[in-house]
From Swiss-Prot:
Record's catalysed reaction(s): The enzyme specifically hydrolyzes (1->4)-beta-D-galactosidic linkages in type I arabinogalactans
Active site: 157 (proton donor), 268 (nucleophile)
Record protein name field: Probable arabinogalactan endo-beta-1,4-galactanase A
Subcellular location: Secreted
Signal peptide: 1-21
Length: 356
C-alpha cells in the first residue's frame, strides 16, 4: 500500500512533465517590444510587478521568440540592428530565436509582398543573388554577435508568392529559385549550429491550398528541392474564415507531414478576449470557447494538442501577445492580447505555455 501511495504521485508528476514537454517550441512573436518600450510601455507580471517582457514570458513557459525582420524600413523598425538588439535580450532570458525574414521593407503577407528598394524587379538572376547575399548577411551578423538562431523562415505567409512581381504565383519557377537562394544564404552562413530553415504559408487549415503551393514549387523544374528546407510553418487564425476548423487544421498538418516529410509548426495564432462584432463567423468546432482570458487558454491548449498529436508536430507561436498599442492585431476582434492593454499586466492565459 505504501508503494502505491508513493508511486501514484510520481506517475502524476511524470505524466504532467511529459505533457508539458510535448512541444519543442512554445513560442511568442514579440517583434513590437522595442517600439512599445520606446513609447514608454512597461510590462507587469501577473502579480503586478514591473519586469522586462522577455522575463515575464520565460517565467510563464515560453522558450522561443519569433522576430520579424524587414530589409530597409524607412524608420528602422524591425531592421537588422533592431532585431540584433531584441535577440540579445531573448537569449539572455534563456529563450531561442526564430527569425522571420519578410524580404520586404514593410509587411509581407498574402496581400503584400513588396520587393525592397534597390532590389531587382525585372531580372530573376539578379534578384536571387540579392536574396542569397542578404540572407547570408543577416545570418552572419547574428553569428558575429554571438547569437545562435534556431529557425530562419525564408519569407512570411508566401502562399501567393514573394518578392513581387518576379515572385508572383504565375511563375513558380521564380518562386522556387528565390527560396533555393534564400536557403543557401542560411546554409552558407557562419552560423553554427545551422538554423532550421522554414517555409511559411498562411491558411494552415486549408490542405488543398498548402498542397497546391508545395506541389508546384517543388515540381517547377527550378532549383528548389525538399532537402533545401527543414520545417513547414503555417498561420492559423480563427477569425478570418468559418472554414478554419480545428478538424481542418488537424487534417492539413497530418497531410503536410506525411506528404512532404517535414516537421510542422503553427507559427501564428491568436484568440480574442473581446470580439463583439466579428467580421466572419467563427469555425463550428470553436464556438464553445468563450471570448475571454480562460478562452485563450482553452484555445491554445487545443491547437497545441493538435500539433503535438501530429507526427513531426513540434511547435506553436502566439502572434504579438503584448502589443498593447494594437490590441486587435489587425483583426475585427477588439482584443487578442495576453497582456491587458490598459494596465500592461500579464493575463493568466500567458501561463498556458507552461502546459503545452
Amino acid at each position: 500500500m505504501l508503494g502505491k501511495t508513493v508511486l501514484l504521485p510520481l506517475l502524476v508528476l511524470l505524466c504532467h512533465s511529459l505533457a508539458s514537454a510535448s512541444l519543442v517550441y512554445r513560442g511568442a512573436d514579440i517583434s513590437s517590444l522595442l517600439i512599445e518600450e520606446k513609447a514608454g510601455i512597461e510590462y507587469k507580471n501577473v502579480n503586478g510587478q514591473t519586469q522586462p517582457l522577455e522575463n515575464i514570458l520565460k517565467a510563464n513557459g515560453v522558450n522561443s521568440v519569433r522576430q520579424r525582420v524587414w530589409v530597409n524600413p524607412s524608420d528602422g523598425s524591425y531592421n537588422l540592428d533592431y532585431n540584433v538588439k531584441l535577440a540579445k535580450r531573448v537569449k539572455a532570458a534563456g529563450m531561442s530565436v526564430y527569425l522571420d525574414l519578410h524580404f520586404s521593407d514593410t509587411w509581407a503577407d498574402p496581400s503584400h509582398q513588396t520587393t525592397p528598394r534597390g532590389w531587382s524587379t525585372n531580372d530573376i538572376g539578379t534578384l536571387t543573388w540579392q536574396v542569397y547575399n542578404y540572407t547570408m548577411e543577416v545570418c552572419n551578423t547574428f553569428a558575429s554577435n554571438g547569437i545562435d538562431v534556431s529557425i530562419v523562415a525564408i519569407g512570411n505567409e508566401i502562399r501567393n508568392g514573394l518578392l513581387w512581381p518576379l515572385g508572383k504565383p504565375d511563375n513558380y519557377a521564380n518562386i522556387a529559385n528565390i527560396l533555393h537562394s534564400a536557403a543557401f544564404g542560411v546554409k552558407d552562413s557562419t552560423l553554427s549550429p545551422k538554423p532550421k530553415i522554414m517555409i511559411h504559408l498562411d491558411n494552415g487549415w486549408d490542405w488543398s491550398a498548402q498542397k497546391f503551393f508545395y506541389d508546384r514549387v517543388l515540381s517547377s523544374g527550378a532549383n528548389l528541392v525538399k532537402s533545401d528546407f527543414d520545417l513547414i510553418g503555417v498561420s492559423y487564425y480563427p477569425f478570418y474564415n468559418p472554414s478554419a476548423t480545428l478538424s481542418a487544421l488537424t487534417t492539413s498538418l497530418k497531410n503536410l507531414r506525411s506528404t512532404y516529410g517535414k516537421d510542422v509548426l503553427v507559427v501564428e495564432t491568436d484568440w480574442p478576449v473581446l470580439c463583439p462584432n466579428p467580421a466572419y463567423a467563427f469555425p463550428s468546432d470553436l464556438k464553445d470557447i468563450p471570448f475571454s482570458v480562460a478562452g485563450q487558454t482553452t484555445f491554445v491548449q487545443r491547437v497545441a494538442n493538435i500539433v503535438a498529436q501530429t507526427p513531426g508536430g513540434i511547435g506553436l507561436y502566439y502572434w504579438e501577445p503584448a502589443w498593447v498599442q494594437n490590441a486587435a492585431l489587425g483583426s475585427s476582434c477588439a482584443d487578442n492580447l495576453m497582456v491587458d492593454w490598459s494596465t500592461r499586466q500579464a493575463r493568466t492565459s500567458l501561463s498556458v505555455f507552461a502546459t503545452i
